[in-house]
Amino acid sequence: MSNEGNGGGPDYDVVRRVVRSRKTAKVLADPDRPVDFDEATRARLDPLVREAILEAGWAPFHYNRAHGGLAEPWRVHLLFQKDCRKVAECLEGWSGDLAPVGKLPSMFAACGAAALITWVPQFRTGGPGAESGKQQAVDDEHLAASASLVQNALLLLTAAGFGTYWSSGGAALREPGIAARLGIDAQESLLALLFVDYPGSPADLSRKPGKNRDLRSDGWLREVSLS
């Protein structure tokens, strides 16, 4: 149902369609036989991914993080296919006995790009002493702002015709040595690993839908009426 003429409009309808059409799809390939997009495809699609991530940076943030000369509390480490294939090939060796890698090599082998999205805690650094309530609130704001960037990125990539999967990144990518290989500073905390499935990827790849999509309801909305 359109909201044009009663407070909505075409922009509302477009955004609503994108929000509803965004869906989780875990795409897997054999790490020994990774997906190989040709140069023309990469030249056409890589800039669209980069642009979507940059536009996602219009997410709101409440406090100036003032870290590394940047106000934003988030960082994005973007890998395109060549480097995704390198991770797929090497991750198990990098990890060794440190942490299980799970399906990550198969996911890196299938994607056209991957974005490691981190946030930069200001007080929640794991050092001695408890944070004050104010400090906890500031870091909660930094984390919430960074999560809004993740959703922006998912919606923009969906609107551009890409498939997406939001992974936590697992334990392996949080190992300091592996994180450093991927450009993640020691002060950053991994929030999301977004895998980007390029249009035209092989149809015979394993694709697993999100398990929670059919569990959605509107029971979380509570309208408050004060007497």
Q: What are the functions of these language-model segments?
A:
Residues M1-C111, S227:
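N-terminal amphipathic, basic helical "cap/leader" segment at the start of enzyme domains
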Residues L98-P100, G161-Y165, E188:
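Short secondary-structure capping/junction motifs at helix and strand boundaries
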Residues Q81-K86, P121-F123, G200:
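Short, charged/polar surface micro-motifs in flexible loops or helix N-caps
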Residues V196-S227:
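C-terminal domain-closing interface element
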Residues A109-Q122:
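Active-site-adjacent structural patch at catalytic or cofactor/ligand-binding sites
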Residues A114-L116, L193-F195, E223:
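Conserved hydrophobic/aromatic beta-strand scaffold that supports enzyme active sites
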Residues A56, P121-I178:
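Small-aliphatic-rich amphipathic alpha-helix that forms the alpha element of a beta-alpha
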Residues P105-M107, A180-R207:
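A glycine-rich helix N-cap at a beta->alpha junction
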